[in-house]
């Protein structure tokens, strides 16, 4: 019986690579030695992949970053109060993509960095008319905040105040008329603005959904066929 046990041990050693595993089992082997280094290396590779993914999403383009609001916050712990800062940042590429994010940290620069990273991950695309204004009017709401957004002719400019202006500047909108009702909380105003922007649809997407041509939709407003076709060609996502 002893010989059979030794033979089984030798076979197990040969199967694992030639050297017997003399390290302690369970806790000792799992937390120390080469295994721990391997786990650290694995985490490093995952971080590298995550970094490359963010660069691909940005596409190497320079983003417009707007610091909307920063305030001091506190957290009550056993030893007293811990003070920190909360930042609200809006990020956009100026070509129809924008997002917002918030971050908290003990120092202001770190809070802004966290908020910027969160905003980049939450970017959404909004269809623009002629690359300068919205396709149609819209309403957005979040909490006690309500906003109304309206498309405007060329040369109007951005008629918006506070946090809403930062959103449209980052988005690349140059002509828009807005109005906010209710709370002046910047967090609620930003969320209400994005709620209105996410409801924007272009005539091209509506035509595809209904199985029609863009010129057919634009010609219903009394415009001639030639004018409708010209307007359809001028529409850009």
UniProtKB/Swiss-Prot annotation:
GO terms for biological process: translation. Keywords: Ribonucleoprotein, Ribosomal protein, RNA-binding, rRNA-binding. Residues 20-55 have a biased composition (Basic and acidic residues). Residues 63-126 form the S5 DRBM domain. One of its GO terms (cellular component) is small ribosomal subunit. Belongs to the universal ribosomal protein uS5 family. With S4 and S12 plays an important role in translational accuracy. Located at the back of the 30S subunit body where it stabilizes the conformation of the head with respect to the body. The N-terminal domain interacts with the head of the 30S subunit; the C-terminal domain interacts with the body and contacts protein S4. The interaction surface between S4 and S5 is involved in control of translational fidelity. Part of the 30S ribosomal subunit. Contacts proteins S4 and S8. This is Small ribosomal subunit protein uS5.
């Amino acid at each position: 019986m002893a010989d059979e046990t030794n033979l089984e041990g030798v076979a197990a050693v040969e199967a694992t690579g030639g050297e017997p595993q003399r390290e302690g089992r369970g806790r000792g082997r799992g937390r120390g030695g080469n295994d721990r280094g391997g786990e650290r290396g694995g985490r490093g590779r995952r971080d590298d992949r995550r970094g490359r993914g963010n660069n691909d999403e940005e596409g190497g383009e320079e983003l417009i970053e707007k610091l909307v609001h920063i305030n001091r916050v506190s957290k009550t712990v056993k030893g007293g109060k811990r003070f920190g800062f909360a930042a609200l940042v809006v990020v956009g590429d100026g070509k129809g993509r924008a997002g917002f994010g918030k971050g908290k940290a003990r120092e202001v620069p770190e809070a802004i960095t966290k908020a910027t990273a969160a905003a980049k991950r939450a970017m959404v695309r909004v269809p623009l008319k002629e690359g300068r204004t919205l396709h149609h009017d819209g309403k957005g709401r979040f909490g006690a905040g309500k906003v109304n957004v309206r498309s405007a002719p060329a040369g109007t400019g951005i008629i918006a105040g506070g946090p809403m202006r930062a959103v449209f500047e980052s988005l690349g909108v140059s002509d828009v008329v807005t109005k906010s009702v209710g709370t002046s909380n910047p967090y609620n105003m930003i969320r209400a603005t994005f709620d209105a922007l996410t409801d924007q649809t272009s005539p091209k997407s509506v035509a595809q959904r209904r199985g029609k041509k863009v010129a057919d939709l634009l010609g219903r407003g009394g415009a001639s066929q030639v004018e409708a076709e010209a307007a359809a060609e001028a529409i850009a996502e």
